[in-house]
Amino acid sequence: MCGIVGFTAPGQDPAAAKQIVQGMADLIRHRGPDGEGCYADGTAALGHRRLSVIDLAGGGQPMLNEDGTLVVVFNGEIYNYKTLRARLQQRGHKFATDSDTEVLLHGYEEWGRDLPCRLRGMFAFAVWDRKRGTLFCARDLFGIKPLCYYKKGETLLFASEIKAFLAHPAFEKRLNEARLPDWLSMEYLPDAETLFTGVYELPPAHTLTWQAGRVTLARYAAPRFRAKRGRSLRAWAREIGDAVAESADAHRIADVEVGCFLSGGVDSSLITCEMARRQPAVQCFSVGYAEEAYSELPAARAAAQALGVPLTETTVTADDFFAANRAIQWYLDEPMPNPAEVPLYFLCKAARQRVKVVLSGEGADELFGGYPLYRQAVWAERWQKMPRAVRRALAALLPGCGLLRRGALPRWQRSARANYVFETTQERDKYLKRDYCAPTPAQRCKPYFDAVRGLDEPTAVQWVDWQTWLPRDILRKADRMSMAHSLELRVPFLDRQVLAAAQALPRRYRCTGRRGKIALRAAAARRLPPQLADAPKRGFPVPLADWLRQEKYYALVKAKLTGPAAERFFDTGALCALLDAHRAGKTNAMTKLWAFYCFIEWYEVYFTGKIPPDL
């Protein structure tokens, strides 16, 4: 795992370009403290920060091919690189290292732009082709590894993290304020835009090609649900269990020790179980709070005992939680008010003291139907099939029922993620100082739903999550919080082979109106004790709502909500009224308050403070 940066600027001075790209790489040093390198010529410059995990002595980057016509920088891991290496050797390619990076170089020579289709892994890479004058970039199928870009004239900037652009003189740092309403509603932007004007994320499963100042994006894979009928749950459980086991084994590849995150839930327990079969006494890590009602530690302890693995525990206090948020917003690049990022930050910090790589359970809910959102979609679909007269009668009888309200809307407007923080745009807009006249968040999500009109509702919601929520929230959080501590986090559920099983799974084995992850839990039951296979989903629960009612943290948050940054964007009187109502127990406004707090803290870090900040 590493950090990559680079840019194109035809006619540039190579020596000056080398200094600039070095400065860009320095801003993401946390992604790779083990080594650095840069390359520059009259058109392109590439930089790299290395976290050495495979081929510790070799594998330095940027890496050039034999005649120096190709230069590559790469972030991630290619789990089938040995298979690809053998195939390339059969075709006459000569290798100088044992690294997966060199496989990308020779793979590009052999297969060109079809290379990403052959890769099994998590990756973001860039290949500068001096002969053709093209820069070719690619991002993995799920968006596990980040890649962002910025174009100004003929100059293209790319990097693992947006903050690297701050070191380039062509970058104009401006807030993409028009998208603030969307962000407040969803806690992320569902498309490729970011909260920095002109900065975009390369979408998952896409390539980017720069040539002569022009940029072209192309999708190289499009995962689709194609259910296979006529198989029993037992057969599916066997296939899914085998796919997850094989993926966990593939994800072990490393020349350093690999550990596991263990929460006590079914996802992390299954991954840990497969690791422990091959690596007895695998180091496991969990995080929790002193407030036991919110802590995962008791469940993690029970799981560790059942699996026979050692567990390192980390406890986060309220002081820890608030003190770390400024650093967390810096590492995230864009504001993220998901409270789960804070315990994850401390969990990664603790794990890095013992191992360099961990396996984690992200992606299981999205692939196998684990979220309550999908079960709600089952009920919404049933509601739509009821006779209109029955629906009207029930709606009149239960006027306050959110499911019935949403059930009357078109599918794309029913998406709960579009109204995650605020029930309506009117409720949200009363806190904003100006009218942004923007499309609603649901309208932003409509193209994704339009692309899967033929799917049943819960399956369509899952697919939209794959394109939006998964890369823009779950995986961004996982990447940035682990890389903040130079820790490589791998996600065995997000694997091509596991995906093949998941997208063929009939809906009734993913979720019903009452249960989720049906086939995955059946697969887990073949390997885990019943209390782990049937463990309820917990996520990272936090006692933040309680803390916001305590004088110390109430005062801290109020100071932020009435400061100069808050005054610029928000009605601070309305914010204080919301905080007071929460403190008095009249409402639970934790999600809203934390969203405002995190945006303000992020804005202060990136737009009013020095770069890089003192952390």
Specify the residue positions occupied by each region the protein language model found:
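Adenosyl-5′-phosphate
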Residues: 1, 167, 197-204, 214, ...
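Cysteine-centered catalytic environments shared across enzyme families
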Residues: 1-332, 344, 348, 526, ...
